Protein backbone atom coordinates (compact mmCIF):
# COMPACT_ATOMS: atom_id res chain seq x y z
CA UNK A 1 0.00 0.00 0.00
CA UNK A 2 1.51 3.29 -1.06
CA UNK A 3 -0.59 5.33 1.34
CA UNK A 4 1.04 5.52 4.74
CA UNK A 5 1.44 7.38 7.97
CA UNK A 6 4.43 9.47 8.89
CA UNK A 7 7.33 7.02 9.38
CA UNK A 8 9.26 9.11 11.88
CA UNK A 9 9.52 12.55 13.42
CA UNK A 10 12.53 14.85 13.05
CA UNK A 11 12.93 16.87 16.23
CA UNK A 12 15.74 19.08 14.98
CA UNK A 13 16.62 20.69 11.69
CA UNK A 14 19.00 18.80 9.45
CA UNK A 15 22.65 19.74 9.37
CA UNK A 16 24.16 21.05 6.15
CA UNK A 17 25.74 17.62 5.63
CA UNK A 18 22.38 15.90 6.09
CA UNK A 19 20.75 18.26 3.61
CA UNK A 20 23.46 17.64 1.03
CA UNK A 21 23.06 13.89 1.54
CA UNK A 22 19.35 14.17 0.77
CA UNK A 23 19.91 16.35 -2.28
CA UNK A 24 22.57 13.97 -3.60
CA UNK A 25 20.35 10.96 -2.96
CA UNK A 26 22.57 9.14 -0.47
CA UNK A 27 20.78 6.16 1.02
CA UNK A 28 20.58 5.79 4.79
CA UNK A 29 17.94 3.07 4.76
CA UNK A 30 15.08 5.56 4.63
CA UNK A 31 13.01 6.77 1.74
CA UNK A 32 14.98 9.57 0.08
CA UNK A 33 13.33 12.95 -0.15
CA UNK A 34 15.16 15.88 -1.69
CA UNK A 35 12.49 18.44 -0.79
CA UNK A 36 14.54 19.79 2.10
CA UNK A 37 13.53 23.39 1.40
CA UNK A 38 9.97 22.70 2.53
CA UNK A 39 11.19 22.77 6.13
CA UNK A 40 11.60 26.29 7.51
CA UNK A 41 14.11 24.90 9.99
CA UNK A 42 16.19 23.48 7.15
CA UNK A 43 15.88 26.81 5.34
CA UNK A 44 17.48 28.55 8.31
CA UNK A 45 20.38 26.10 8.16
CA UNK A 46 20.80 26.71 4.44
CA UNK A 47 20.71 30.50 4.78
CA UNK A 48 23.41 30.36 7.45
CA UNK A 49 25.58 28.10 5.28
CA UNK A 50 25.15 30.34 2.22
CA UNK A 51 25.97 33.47 4.21
CA UNK A 52 29.07 31.84 5.68
CA UNK A 53 30.27 30.82 2.22
CA UNK A 54 29.68 34.30 0.80
CA UNK A 55 31.60 35.89 3.66
CA UNK A 56 34.58 33.68 2.90
CA UNK A 57 34.42 34.50 -0.81
CA UNK A 58 33.85 38.23 -0.29
CA UNK A 59 35.23 39.22 3.13
CA UNK A 60 35.01 42.94 2.33
CA UNK A 61 31.22 42.66 2.48
CA UNK A 62 30.92 40.07 5.23
CA UNK A 63 29.00 42.41 7.53
CA UNK A 64 26.35 42.93 4.87
CA UNK A 65 25.97 39.20 4.27
CA UNK A 66 25.74 38.55 8.01
CA UNK A 67 23.13 41.27 8.51
CA UNK A 68 21.02 40.12 5.57
CA UNK A 69 21.16 36.51 6.74
CA UNK A 70 20.20 37.49 10.27
CA UNK A 71 17.21 39.51 9.05
CA UNK A 72 16.01 36.71 6.78
CA UNK A 73 16.45 34.04 9.45
CA UNK A 74 14.35 36.18 11.78
CA UNK A 75 11.53 36.08 9.20
CA UNK A 76 11.93 32.32 8.76
CA UNK A 77 11.85 31.81 12.51
CA UNK A 78 8.71 33.92 12.87
CA UNK A 79 6.94 31.91 10.16
CA UNK A 80 8.14 28.67 11.75
CA UNK A 81 6.54 29.85 14.99
CA UNK A 82 3.31 30.65 13.16
CA UNK A 83 3.22 27.10 11.75
CA UNK A 84 3.80 25.61 15.19
CA UNK A 85 1.10 27.78 16.76
CA UNK A 86 -1.36 26.79 14.03
CA UNK A 87 -0.67 23.09 14.56
CA UNK A 88 -0.80 23.39 18.35
CA UNK A 89 -4.24 24.97 18.13
CA UNK A 90 -5.60 22.73 15.39
CA UNK A 91 -8.48 20.33 15.85
CA UNK A 92 -6.73 17.70 13.72
CA UNK A 93 -3.15 16.48 13.45
CA UNK A 94 -3.34 14.55 10.16
CA UNK A 95 -3.23 15.59 6.52
CA UNK A 96 -4.10 13.46 3.50
CA UNK A 97 -2.70 13.98 0.01
CA UNK A 98 -4.34 12.56 -3.08
CA UNK A 99 -1.08 13.14 -4.87
CA UNK A 100 2.68 12.83 -4.46
CA UNK A 101 3.90 13.90 -1.04
CA UNK A 102 6.92 16.25 -0.99
CA UNK A 103 6.06 17.74 2.42
CA UNK A 104 7.61 15.09 4.65
CA UNK A 105 10.02 17.53 6.29
CA UNK A 106 7.26 20.03 6.95
CA UNK A 107 4.96 17.56 8.70
CA UNK A 108 7.88 16.10 10.63
CA UNK A 109 8.80 19.55 11.93
CA UNK A 110 5.40 19.98 13.59
CA UNK A 111 4.57 16.42 14.61
CA UNK A 112 1.83 15.87 12.05
CA UNK A 113 0.83 12.50 10.62
CA UNK A 114 0.05 12.02 6.96
CA UNK A 115 -1.43 9.71 4.38
CA UNK A 116 -0.52 10.03 0.70
CA UNK A 117 -1.11 8.25 -2.57
CA UNK A 118 2.56 8.36 -3.56
CA UNK A 119 5.94 9.21 -2.08
CA UNK A 120 7.33 12.68 -2.77
CA UNK A 121 9.75 11.55 -5.45
CA UNK A 122 7.47 9.01 -7.08
CA UNK A 123 6.97 9.10 -10.84
CA UNK A 124 3.61 7.35 -10.45
CA UNK A 125 0.43 9.18 -11.38
CA UNK A 126 -2.19 6.43 -11.48
CA UNK A 127 -3.28 5.11 -8.09
CA UNK A 128 -4.69 1.63 -7.65
CA UNK A 129 -8.28 1.00 -6.63
CA UNK A 130 -6.97 -0.22 -3.27
CA UNK A 131 -5.09 3.03 -2.66
CA UNK A 132 -8.09 5.20 -3.57
CA UNK A 133 -10.36 3.09 -1.37
CA UNK A 134 -7.91 3.19 1.54
CA UNK A 135 -7.51 6.97 1.37
CA UNK A 136 -11.26 7.58 1.04
CA UNK A 137 -11.89 5.43 4.11
CA UNK A 138 -9.24 7.40 6.02
CA UNK A 139 -10.95 10.67 5.09
CA UNK A 140 -14.21 9.29 6.49
CA UNK A 141 -12.61 7.71 9.55
CA UNK A 142 -10.72 10.87 10.54
CA UNK A 143 -13.43 13.31 9.48
CA UNK A 144 -11.02 15.23 7.29
CA UNK A 145 -12.48 18.34 5.63
CA UNK A 146 -9.97 18.42 2.76
CA UNK A 147 -7.97 16.27 0.41
CA UNK A 148 -4.71 17.98 -0.46
CA UNK A 149 -2.76 18.09 -3.71
CA UNK A 150 0.42 19.73 -4.91
CA UNK A 151 0.62 22.41 -7.57
CA UNK A 152 -0.36 21.46 -11.10
CA UNK A 153 -3.49 21.22 -13.20
CA UNK A 154 -4.31 17.56 -12.69
CA UNK A 155 -6.18 16.98 -9.44
CA UNK A 156 -8.22 14.04 -10.73
CA UNK A 157 -6.92 11.60 -8.13
CA UNK A 158 -7.88 13.89 -5.23
CA UNK A 159 -11.30 14.41 -6.80
CA UNK A 160 -11.74 10.65 -7.19
CA UNK A 161 -10.91 10.16 -3.51
CA UNK A 162 -13.54 12.75 -2.55
CA UNK A 163 -16.16 11.03 -4.73
CA UNK A 164 -15.32 7.76 -2.99
CA UNK A 165 -15.99 9.09 0.51
CA UNK A 166 -19.32 8.78 2.29
CA UNK A 167 -20.00 12.52 2.29
CA UNK A 168 -18.46 13.38 -1.09
CA UNK A 169 -18.20 16.99 0.09
CA UNK A 170 -14.56 17.52 1.03
CA UNK A 171 -12.64 20.38 -0.50
CA UNK A 172 -9.62 19.78 -2.73
CA UNK A 173 -6.90 22.23 -1.69
CA UNK A 174 -3.42 22.76 -3.09
CA UNK A 175 -0.10 23.21 -1.31
CA UNK A 176 2.83 24.51 -3.34
CA UNK A 177 6.11 22.57 -3.24
CA UNK A 178 7.83 25.21 -5.37
CA UNK A 179 9.08 22.56 -7.77
CA UNK A 180 7.35 24.36 -10.65
CA UNK A 181 8.34 27.92 -9.75
CA UNK A 182 9.20 29.98 -12.84
CA UNK A 183 10.99 33.24 -13.49
CA UNK A 184 7.58 34.69 -14.33
CA UNK A 185 6.32 33.74 -10.86
CA UNK A 186 9.32 35.48 -9.32
CA UNK A 187 8.77 38.56 -11.48
CA UNK A 188 5.18 38.63 -10.25
CA UNK A 189 6.39 38.77 -6.67
CA UNK A 190 6.45 35.13 -5.59
CA UNK A 191 9.08 34.44 -2.94
CA UNK A 192 9.95 31.52 -0.72
CA UNK A 193 8.31 33.25 2.23
CA UNK A 194 5.15 34.20 0.35
CA UNK A 195 4.64 30.63 -0.87
CA UNK A 196 5.21 29.20 2.59
CA UNK A 197 2.73 31.72 4.01
CA UNK A 198 0.11 30.55 1.49
CA UNK A 199 0.89 26.95 2.39
CA UNK A 200 0.26 27.83 6.03
CA UNK A 201 -3.17 29.19 5.16
CA UNK A 202 -4.03 25.96 3.35
CA UNK A 203 -2.67 23.84 6.19
CA UNK A 204 -4.80 25.72 8.72
CA UNK A 205 -7.92 24.95 6.70
CA UNK A 206 -6.94 21.30 6.32
CA UNK A 207 -6.45 20.92 10.08
CA UNK A 208 -9.53 22.91 11.11
Predicted regions and their residues:
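Extracytoplasmic metal-acquisition and chelation regions
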Residues: 1-208
